[in-house]
Swiss-Prot record:
<protein>
    <recommendedName>
        <fullName>Large ribosomal subunit protein bL33c</fullName>
    </recommendedName>
</protein>
<dbReference type="InterPro" id="IPR001705">
    <property type="entry name" value="Ribosomal_bL33"/>
</dbReference>
<keyword id="KW-0687">Ribonucleoprotein</keyword>
<keyword id="KW-0934">Plastid</keyword>
<dbReference type="Pfam" id="PF00471">
    <property type="entry name" value="Ribosomal_L33"/>
</dbReference>
<dbReference type="GO" id="GO:0006412">
    <property type="term" value="P:translation"/>
</dbReference>
<dbReference type="InterPro" id="IPR018264">
    <property type="entry name" value="Ribosomal_bL33_CS"/>
</dbReference>
<dbReference type="GO" id="GO:0005840">
    <property type="term" value="C:ribosome"/>
</dbReference>
<keyword id="KW-0689">Ribosomal protein</keyword>
<dbReference type="GO" id="GO:0003735">
    <property type="term" value="F:structural constituent of ribosome"/>
</dbReference>
<comment type="similarity">
    <text>Belongs to the bacterial ribosomal protein bL33 family.</text>
</comment>
<dbReference type="GO" id="GO:0009507">
    <property type="term" value="C:chloroplast"/>
</dbReference>
<dbReference type="InterPro" id="IPR038584">
    <property type="entry name" value="Ribosomal_bL33_sf"/>
</dbReference>
<dbReference type="InterPro" id="IPR011332">
    <property type="entry name" value="Ribosomal_zn-bd"/>
</dbReference>
<dbReference type="GO" id="GO:1990904">
    <property type="term" value="C:ribonucleoprotein complex"/>
</dbReference>
<keyword id="KW-0150">Chloroplast</keyword>
Length: 66
């Protein structure tokens, strides 16, 4: 039958270089992606290389809390 909690959860990935540059006001915004992860296979925070339209390059996007 059904388990207690859903295994797949929605996570938000945020550009780490835009967050650092936001202190200097160099970037126009912060790039964010919404994706899913399996809670059992990936219990730690997710980090992926994604394209950032504000930095104009591929950067590390890390998981943030909702």
């Amino acid at each position: 039958m059904a388990k207690g909690k859903d295994v797949r959860i929605r996570v938000i990935l945020e550009c780490t270089s835009c967050v650092r540059n936001d202190l200097n006001k160099e970037s126009r915004g912060i790039s964010r992606y919404i994706t899913q992860k399996n809670r059992h296979n990936t219990p730690s925070r997710l980090e992926l290389r994604k394209f950032c339209p504000y930095c104009y390059k591929h950067t590390i996007h890390g998981e943030i809390k909702k």
